[in-house]
């Protein structure tokens, strides 16, 4: 007889996924998020009762953290006991199928709850003094579509477009974000087609309370736009002009100033790294800008919690 037959598990090492879920259990504002979603949840008058709302919210978060499709999330719940424990499935409880998981996502999309999820999470972070709002860093990143995303007529998503970056063409969308200049936490998210110029979205990435904005050379001309006045724009010098400046007496001083600005701008890259590398969101998952932008808002909201989790855990233990 094996130890597993007796119900004994001699393994004590926790995986990175288990550690992450344990951390998220303690730092996520579960109560506030449920209060946000509950008024929109369907109520069954007859037939089988709907799945527990808290369970479905946790499954939705699992999908974002580990890059799971609806089908993959269903299968993961069957395969991994620690997933079931995290979402609250025990004993003989039913496991939500892919259709139920899909319907919950559609519920969030239908009632435009993803921006509000970002607001709820940021309110928690602001309460801990992690969002100062005195400065903003803006930037955008390309998120390509998978090469096989065509409909039955062989046509690509009409809401996505192609653009050239360097010597390479990309087909997909852009995620534009505004982050807190001090903490690097995201406060604003906008999704557009890939061919939209960054500078056209710069003003929309500001929350209105900042006094200074940092941006790369792609935002040249932003201070001259009518909708972007009233703040101090610190925009990177174009590479060609920066190279010429090195030949002038002020070159060394200007180079130091550019390096200081680059150090602040670097914080905007951290959320991009989290959603693309940590959460695995390197390609768009759905068709259409609305659905993909909604997912991006949830991803960046969860990336804020992920980036601030060490501070939140420390304060929770204090």
Q: Which functions belong to the PLM regions below?
A:
Residues 2-5, 28, 52-53, 57, ...:
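Polybasic low-complexity intrinsically disordered regions
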Residues 21-35, 40-46, 51-71:
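A positively charged, amphipathic N-terminal helix/segment that binds anionic biomolecules
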Residues 3-7, 11, 211-212, 217-290, ...:
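Helix-centered, glycine/charged polyanion-binding patches within enzymatic domains
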Residues 1-31, 38-39, 314-317:
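Charged, often Cys/His-bearing segments associated with DNA-binding zinc-finger transcription factors
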Residues 83-102, 235, 241-250:
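Phosphate-backbone recognition surface of nucleic-acid-processing proteins
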Residues 46-53, 167, 286-296:
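Structural motif
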Residues 34-42, 122, 272, 276:
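Amphipathic, well-packed alpha-helical segments that form the structural scaffold of globular domains
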Residues 40-46, 88, 161-163:
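Active-site-adjacent structural elements in folded domains
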């Amino acid at each position: 007889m094996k130890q597993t037959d007796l119900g004994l598990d001699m393994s004590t090492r926790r995986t990175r996924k288990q550690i992450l879920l344990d951390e998220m259990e303690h730092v996520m504002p579960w109560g506030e998020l449920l209060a946000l979603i509950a008024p929109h949840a369907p109520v069954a008058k007859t037939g089988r009762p709907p799945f527990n709302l808290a369970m479905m919210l946790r499954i939705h978060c699992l999908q974002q953290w580990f890059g799971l499709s609806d089908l993959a999330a269903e299968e993961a719940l069957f395969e991994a006991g620690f997933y079931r424990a995290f979402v609250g499935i025990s004993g003989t409880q039913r496991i939500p199928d892919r259709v139920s998981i899909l319907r919950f996502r559609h519920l969030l999309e239908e009632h435009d709850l993803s921006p509000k999820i970002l607001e709820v999470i940021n309110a928690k972070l602001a309460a801990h003094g992690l969002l100062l709002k005195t400065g903003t860093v803006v930037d955008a990143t390309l998120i390509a579509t998978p090469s096989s995303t065509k409909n039955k007529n062989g046509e690509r998503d009409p809401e996505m477009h192609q653009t050239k970056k360097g010597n390479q063409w990309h087909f997909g969308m852009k995620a534009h974000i505004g982050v807190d200049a001090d903490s690097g936490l995201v406060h604003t998210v906008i999704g557009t087609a890939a061919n939209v110029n960054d500078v056209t979205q710069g003003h929309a990435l500001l929350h209105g309370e900042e006094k200074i904005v940092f941006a790369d050379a792609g935002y040249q001309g932003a201070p001259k736009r009518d909708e972007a006045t009233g703040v101090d724009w610190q925009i990177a010098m174009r590479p060609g002009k920066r190279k010429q400046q090195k030949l002038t007496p002020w070159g060394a001083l200007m180079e130091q100033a550019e390096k200081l600005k680059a150090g602040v701008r670097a914080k905007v890259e951290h959320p991009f790294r989290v959603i693309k590398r940590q959460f695995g969101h390197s390609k768009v998952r759905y068709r259409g800008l609305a659905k993909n932008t909604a997912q991006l808002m949830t991803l960046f909201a969860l990336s804020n919690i992920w980036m601030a989790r060490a501070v939140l855990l420390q304060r929770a233990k204090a």
